[in-house]
From Swiss-Prot:
<dbReference type="InterPro" id="IPR006269">
    <property type="entry name" value="KDO8P_synthase"/>
</dbReference>
<keyword id="KW-0963">Cytoplasm</keyword>
<comment type="similarity">
    <text>Belongs to the KdsA family.</text>
</comment>
<keyword id="KW-0808">Transferase</keyword>
<dbReference type="InterPro" id="IPR013785">
    <property type="entry name" value="Aldolase_TIM"/>
</dbReference>
<keyword id="KW-0448">Lipopolysaccharide biosynthesis</keyword>
<comment type="pathway">
    <text>Carbohydrate biosynthesis; 3-deoxy-D-manno-octulosonate biosynthesis; 3-deoxy-D-manno-octulosonate from D-ribulose 5-phosphate: step 2/3.</text>
</comment>
<comment type="pathway">
    <text>Bacterial outer membrane biogenesis; lipopolysaccharide biosynthesis.</text>
</comment>
<dbReference type="Pfam" id="PF00793">
    <property type="entry name" value="DAHP_synth_1"/>
</dbReference>
<protein>
    <recommendedName>
        <fullName>2-dehydro-3-deoxyphosphooctonate aldolase</fullName>
        <ecNumber>2.5.1.55</ecNumber>
    </recommendedName>
</protein>
<dbReference type="GO" id="GO:0005829">
    <property type="term" value="C:cytosol"/>
</dbReference>
<dbReference type="GO" id="GO:0046364">
    <property type="term" value="P:monosaccharide biosynthetic process"/>
</dbReference>
<dbReference type="InterPro" id="IPR006218">
    <property type="entry name" value="DAHP1/KDSA"/>
</dbReference>
<dbReference type="GO" id="GO:0008676">
    <property type="term" value="F:3-deoxy-8-phosphooctulonate synthase activity"/>
</dbReference>
<dbReference type="GO" id="GO:0019294">
    <property type="term" value="P:keto-3-deoxy-D-manno-octulosonic acid biosynthetic process"/>
</dbReference>
Length: 278
């Protein structure tokens, strides 16, 4: 079980790692509008406050790896940072967003409490170094093409850049064409590096390029995977949430409905209690 102690990572008043309740990182896939972000952040925070779950808001200012050049990418860095700032100020929550190029790290770190390295870019040394040098916590998503033990080299890149505020995230592995699976052993293997482990339960059910010009997914598998990850004892759950996934501008097929989140989290808490005894 993943309840052994690890290097704890502190983000504001939130601590990742150790024998404590999981942290929730959740929000829409991409920044669609300030109104949508407010609705999601406010709704999730209310739920988490009721249930006693520590919450971090997530959203991307640029989806730089969309399947089609015609797909919506987001508002861009400058506008995106303004939108995240409003979320922080209005709801008093930490925020996380992804960076795609080294030059973005310094600017994003002025607003974001956690920088995220996308799975496709997890081996990009210059990007990792730039993120590490901000001194902020960094969530590194394991590439769909990597074995979990290959993440050790990525951890060393961060450590050698004098940043140990590291979190590692499982988001599924490529399984043939247009499909992904989750090897639950990855959660155990990555925990051996002595850093908190996050389970991205919504991207793990994607079917990359499954719609030809967009990614599809199987939302029905999010729930059992979530329960399985918590049974292992992960430090945090990462999930994309939307009021109406069918109308989402990115990743709709694998996103959770905001209206369903509270009941899902109630079950999650019970599993977490059994596993961690907290």
């Amino acid at each position: 079980m993943l309840i052994n102690d690890v290097n704890k990572v502190k983000v504001g008043n939130i601590v990742f790692g150790g024998k404590k309740r999981f942290v929730l990182i959740a929000g829409p896939c991409v920044m669609e509008s300030q109104e949508l972000m407010d609705e999601v952040a406010g709704g999730i925070k209310e739920i988490c406050d009721r249930l006693g779950i520590e919450y971090i808001f997530k959203a991307s200012f640029d989806k730089a790896n969309r399947s089609s050049i015609y797909s919506y990418r987001g508002p861009g860095l400058e506008e995106g940072m303004k939108m995240l700032t409003k979320i922080k100020e209005k709801f008093n929550v930490p925020v996380i967003t992804d960076v795609h190029e080294a030059w973005q790290c310094k600017e994003v770190a002025k607003v974001a409490d956690i920088l995220q390295i996308p799975a496709f870019l997890c081996r990009q040394t210059d990007l990792l170094i730039a993120a590490a040098e901000t001194g902020k916590a960094v969530n590194i998503k394991k590439g769909q093409f990597l074995a979990p033990w290959d993440m050790k080299n990525i951890v060393v890149k961060m450590e050698e850049s004098r940043n140990k505020n590291i979190m590692l995230c499982e988001r599924g592995s490529t399984f043939g064409y247009n499909n992904m699976v989750v090897d639950m052993r990855s959660l155990l293997e990555m925990r051996k590096f002595n850093y908190p482990v996050i389970f991205d339960v919504t991207h793990s059910v994607q079917k990359p390029g499954g719609l030809g010009t967009a990614t599809s997914g199987d939302r029905e598998y999010v729930y059992p995977l979530l329960r399985a990850g918590l049974a292992i004892g992960v430090d945090a759950i990462f999930a994309e949430v939307h009021p109406n996934p069918a109308e989402a501008k990115s990743d709709g097929p694998n996103m959770l409905y905001l209206k369903d989140l509270e009941e899902i989290l109630k079950i999650a808490i019970e599993i977490d209690k059994i596993v961690k005894g907290v």
